Amino acid sequence: MRLDLTRAILRLMHVNTVLRDYFLEFGEDVNVDANKLLLRAGEVAKYLYLIQSGAVRLCVRNAEGAETTVQFFFEDDMVCSLESMLSGCPSGLELITMEACQLRVLDRDTVLTKFQSHATMPSELLALTQQRLVEYINLYTIAIAQTPTQRYQAMLVSQPDKLARIPLHILAGYLGVTPVHLSRIRRRLKSGPGSQAF
């Protein structure tokens, strides 16, 4: 088990050496069922998760309680509401498992203690935060610049295995369309290249 965990951690491009060491030394293995809330909006993030197996989504709820997924995370991804964890402010996001997950978990106190005691930890967490910011800017820009059909096609090309694991109603919300509209997009794409884009 430890060798598999080490391999998974070493594959992480965005998790630095210090965080890898902390996940190995201080992290705990936790198994979580599908559709379980890891972080509720309005709460301070208490845990940093490394996904060993499974899938997690980050979502936001509007005033009426309807949720929209803003990002998906899969094996070897590290996830939390980083801004909440570091600032101590309540998160505006929810973190929910989409599949049963095996997670490696670091608690906030350990991360913050190491943040203060390890000389390179602040710069490494800053680099991680900057990377996440770039990802969010790209997501935002693509959401504005591309149609839902174009975004779906891009996901089909770049992440077909991951795309197949996302429930269609969640994917529809992520793309900003209804499940019926997503069904039409998928049907049109299957029917051939001469089809009209939405």
Where are these regions (language model features)?
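Localized chelating/binding microdomains
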Residues: 10-20, 48-51, 61, 102, ...
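Residues that recognize and position ribonucleotide moieties
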Residues: 30, 49, 71, 96, ...
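Phosphate-/nucleic-acid-contacting segments
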Residues: 146-198
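Cyclic nucleotide-binding regulatory module and flanking cytosolic helices
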Residues: 1-29, 84
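Cyclic nucleotide-binding regulatory domains
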Residues: 37-98
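A small-molecule sensor/coupling module
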Residues: 91, 110-147, 151
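Short, basic/aromatic recognition patches
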Residues: 30-37
